[in-house]
Amino acid sequence: MTLQARNLTLARGGAPILTDVSLTLAPGALVGLLGANGAGKSTLLAALAGELAPRSGQVFLGDADLATLSARQLARRRAVLPQKPSLSFDLGVSDVVGMGAYPFPELDPAAVRQLVRDALEQAGVTHLAQRRYPQLSGGEQQRVQFARVLAQCHAMHAPGQTRYLMLDEPISNLDPRHQMELLATARALAHEAGMGVLVIVHDINQAARWCDTLALLADGRLAALGPPADVLTPDHMRRVYGIEADVLAHPTLPGRLLVLAR
């Protein structure tokens, strides 16, 4: 079962944000969404998540139009990590991670506690479990929010049902080590757990290293879609980002690319 955007067009205040964009998120794949600032990446993710209604076009989860699904139904099938999660309450870290279980009231307290422990460990933030969320650094908060959506993903596990995870710039506040750890986890969720994972990143080389497929947006349109070798070309770098770049085989990662801006 795939999550599929078909010919999406979306505008705000009369200004086009997305124009005729089609994209498929399939189980077992990590898809990277690239583009310059203002290209429409976050808008496309929100439309795929069912949080924004397109002016035209549709998003399908299997055969179901997302517009026909309730917020609770969506939350039981896909988890979303927004670019800037808003949380103004003075909650403990474990309580924040436990919010991932909110769409699953059938879970008993013991099951929720286990979900929280597993998510904290998978996100590498077990040592923060007893801290208060507002006291954390920006990077620590980002990793705790990642643990929250991991808890949601684990809670939604059901035989024969594909799960989806959407991450909007999840590494923007992280140091290099934690960037790699988060993206490695995202790829493992796709390759090993069979989830469909979409991630927005600005670091082209991180996208080239971790993603199976790349979608390159430019001015609200899909400029390129395919494996990294087809998308990360000097011509695309010039047309989308306005930079001259050399695209080389990665010196230590077989089959991966390295993009060097001149």
UniProtKB/Swiss-Prot annotation:
Pfam families: ABC_tran
Primary site of residence: membrane
GO CC terms of this entry: plasma membrane
SMART domains (alphabetical): AAA (SM00382)
Record: residues binding ATP: G35, A36, N37, G38, A39, G40, K41, S42
EC number: 7.6.2.-
Domain named ABC transporter: residues: 3-244
SUPFAM superfamilies: P-loop containing nucleoside triphosphate hydrolases
Localization per Swiss-Prot or TrEMBL: Cell inner membrane
GO molecular function, one term: ATP binding
Keyword ATP-binding: yes
The keyword Translocase is assigned to this record: yes
Key words, A-Z: ATP-binding, Cell inner membrane, Cell membrane, Membrane, Nucleotide-binding, Translocase, Transport
Topology class, membrane: Peripheral membrane protein
Subunit structure, interactors included: The complex is composed of two ATP-binding proteins (HmuV), two transmembrane proteins (HmuU) and a solute-binding protein (HmuT).
Protein family: Belongs to the ABC transporter superfamily. Heme (hemin) importer (TC 3.A.1.14.5) family.
Role this protein plays: Part of the ABC transporter complex HmuTUV involved in hemin import. Responsible for energy coupling to the transport system.
Protein name: Hemin import ATP-binding protein HmuV
